[in-house]
């Protein structure tokens, strides 16, 4: 018996994290990208999508976060290159915690005449909740108007998540789900049937 799973990927950028929304003519030259993951799950399968000059479908469509930042296989060590690198990784418990990556397109800038929109999925097909922030770098032929900065509360990083927090959340989830023996990781000792 053969089973197939059909996954419909996003190609229009809807729901993705927006790291650049530029109007005018110029060249995109880089990004610093910060991820705070509340889970040890690998966050890096989010595809990057760059829409040039008002495209509805991205002409630059990547294959995953780590690929966009010139790495592969879920990097867990710090490394630095002039044009890309992982400046911070939390190697204590999977990918729980904060990561900082960067990429500069100095030798291969992305040119645009009217606009550039850069997005990246948070997890494969936006399946993860992540605290993401970024800084985009570009040169522009004329000064543009930037949107107002978000309120301070929206720009403040979320509290650092520790292993204990995950256990507490899991305990609450199990309690709310009935603490049954069918739940994954059954650490509750149920009384045997008498």
What does each of the following model-derived ranges do?
Residues 47-142:
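Extended, compositionally biased non-globular segments
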Residues 11-19:
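Surface-exposed ligand/attachment interfaces on beta-rich extracellular proteins
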Residues 23-30, 43, 113:
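Extended extracellular/luminal ectodomain segments enriched in beta-structured repeat modules
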Residues 26-38, 117-122, 194:
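A short beta-strand element within beta-rich, extracytoplasmic domains
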Residues 41-42, 60, 148:
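Short helix/loop capping segments that flank catalytic or ligand/cofactor-binding pockets
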Residues 2-7:
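Short, small-residue-biased leader/transition segments that mark boundaries at the very start
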Residues 39-41, 128:
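Short consensus segments that form the blades of beta-propeller domains
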Residues 109-193:
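TerminUS-proximal long segments
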